[in-house]
A protein has these predicted regions:
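HotDog/MaoC-like acyl-thioester-processing domains
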Residues: 1-4, 63-65, 76-119
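Hydrophobic beta-strand-centered segment that forms part of the acyl-chain substrate-binding groove
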Residues: 35-83, 96-98, 104
Length: 119
């Protein structure tokens, strides 16, 4: 499990003081950074190897500006060329959002998926 702390910004709030729903998927992506490094250690797009093929977000509770959030990220399932990431956002000990992302190990030069290495 990977734990990532994020401090909400004023610009991420809406008119009633909640964190706007569009930022939850962005925060989830921030939590995937170390998983990205497994496939592209330098995080450079010349050698990028992942294609996002599905993302789901479930909003469970409200998020606010006043307290930092914790993104919890883990790999749930690994297939031949794809893997599934489970994600949660917690704030003040409350589960506020959960999601899932599926990535394919992808060769962009050859335009095709590739098997995930055991390394």
């Amino acid at each position: 499990m990977i734990f990532t702390k994020i401090v909400p910004r004023v610009s991420e709030t809406d008119g009633v003081g909640h964190i706007n729903n569009v930022f939850v998927p962005i925060w989830f992506e921030a939590g995937r950074r170390e998983i990205f490094r497994i496939f592209s250690p330098k995080l450079d797009f010349l050698n990028w190897k992942l294609a996002l093929v599905k993302v789901t977000v479930e909003y469970v509770d409200q998020l606010y500006l006043a307290a930092e959030v914790e993104i919890r990220t883990g790999i749930e399932k690994v297939g031949n060329s794809s893997f599934t990431i489970k994600e949660e956002i917690h704030q003040t000990k409350r589960l506020c959002a959960k999601g899932e992302a599926i990535y394919v190990n992808y060769n962009f030069q050859e335009n095709k998926s590739e098997a995930i290495s055991n390394e």
